[in-house]
């Protein structure tokens, strides 16, 4: 009977800890999260929406808690939300370069099938983060499920600077997605004149110039 009471009390305590943990993450309450982890709460526990605490901390954002979670030994740095996004992908959306670097240092996947962090950073024109990903061997022409590349995303949604960065780093402007569209087509479709001019200038500069034939003597 005593054992049953102890176990029941433990289950109620853990239920309370479960709620407290995710509320504390949302509130960026690093003190409470730290206390719960020291009591043995599993850092990789998912919330009621099957979302990992690290994903929640980055999405909120709750930067202090995110750093605390990253510092734990058993943290999973590659969990996915229901949309298939990882912590590094969310950090790439928000342009959180310092956090992205820590994620990479802990083993976060820079390359993965489908949408990749570089797609996200390029979409939002986060140049510093784009450079970080490329320095860690992000595949520059990564293909999304519809075969769109980071350059295409930058051309349609990002900035001319993001387009220029990718082109100068070796992105292929001639690639086409599943709809047969190139990065230039993306820029035109979105009425992005700055991206159109950037891609056109790059293509023109790399096109071999015709050599004028010498006049017969």
Which positions does each model-derived feature cover?
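Intrinsically disordered, low-complexity regulatory segments in ankyrin-centric signaling systems
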Residues: 9-41, 48-51, 67, 71, ...
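Ankyrin repeat A-helix N-terminal signature
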Residues: 23-28, 56-62, 90-96, 120-126, ...
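Ankyrin-repeat boundary/"N-cap" motif
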Residues: 16-21, 46-52, 80-86, 112-117, ...
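Ankyrin repeat structural motif
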Residues: 29-37, 62-71, 96-104, 126-134, ...
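Bacterial N-terminal signal peptides
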Residues: 1-9
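Ankyrin-repeat-protein effector appendages
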Residues: 13-20, 136, 169, 178-181, ...
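Alpha-helical adaptor scaffolds
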Residues: 111, 115-135
